[in-house]
Curated annotation (Swiss-Prot):
This is Chorismate synthase. CDD domains: Chorismate_synthase. Belongs to the chorismate synthase family. SUPFAM superfamilies: Chorismate synthase, AroC. Pathway: Metabolic intermediate biosynthesis; chorismate biosynthesis; chorismate from D-erythrose 4-phosphate and phosphoenolpyruvate: step 7/7. Disulfide bonds: none annotated. GO terms for cellular component: cytosol. Reduced FMN (FMNH(2)). One of its GO terms (biological process) is aromatic amino acid family biosynthetic process. It catalyses: 5-O-(1-carboxyvinyl)-3-phosphoshikimate = chorismate + phosphate.
Amino acid sequence: MSMNSFGHLFRVTTWGESHGPALGATVDGCPPNVAVSEEMLQHWLDKRRPGQNKNTTQRNEPDAVRILSGVFEGKSTGTPIQLMIENTDQRSRDYGEIAQTFRPGHADITYFQKYGNRDYRGGGRSSARETAARVAAGGVAREALKSLAPGIEIKGYMTRMGEMEIDRARFDWSAIDQNDFWIPDAAAVQDWEDYLQALRKQHDSVGAVVEVVARGVPAGIGAPIYGKLDTDLAAAMMSINAVKAVEIGEGMNAALLKGSENADEIFMGNDGAPVYSSNHAGGILGGISTGQDVVIRFAVKPTSSILTPRQSIRKDGTAAEVITKGRHDPCVGIRAVPVAEAMMAFVILDHILLHRGQIGENQGVIGAPD
């Protein structure tokens, strides 16, 4: 299997399977002398860790990360950083019945069609368990951003879960870390929990919309045409398990607007920097950052592993009824939030490194004489 790496100069390769002995990431291209510790990476992993509340999978993994290389005396050396997370709470017996059967909505059938072999235990490589490695590597990216571009803040949150949607009039950044759903609407939390638990009792699952914002991204990051910042951001988010659609800025809603409504007007601020009247562009124009918030959102499909009987086929082509056992998230969007933050950090850091390598400092100074 190839295509397990992401990035240009800051490059992350993940490895491992859901029920294997361990999984992890190799981070190549991290600048030297960046503060990196297991404790710091653990902080981000704990946001994603399973088994912490009744709204996520009950698989109870500590997700304890070990740094095997690339860090000396608390600082990156500039060489590859190897991260490892042991799997300790596998329950592979739950998957014995699907060894010969393809689960509807899963990658079981496509992996078999492509490779002729698959690890059916928990989905193997296609499991969302793989994203733990991304979150650990994302911690490295965040620390590098602190050194190279202090002031950048990355925050993800859910805006929708099935029929439930946040009220943006009540949007509160401080509420995001205070509830199990990572939503910026504290008044909606109980309704969301009641809705999800009702679905769980029905042996069903639900999809979600996750939004990620990067504040403080300097103008000029990205490149035209094939090197667009939004191209890599879209690819990063689409690579997350179960993601089926990505929007940047106004996204699909831009098709409903007139040009006079969608174009963000520009003024000169009192500090001599451009000020925009709105941010329909999501902080990116022509593939290059404007200096506004970079805003991206994506849709996550409902978890396919449910106890409701579904029709499928076996490897020999005969019909089968599938009831997926095991411990699964009723809404995978909840734990996708820290994964999305990690992917945003990867891309922003990667493009800052690319920008410095090609341009150095921004060349166009607005307000300067010709």
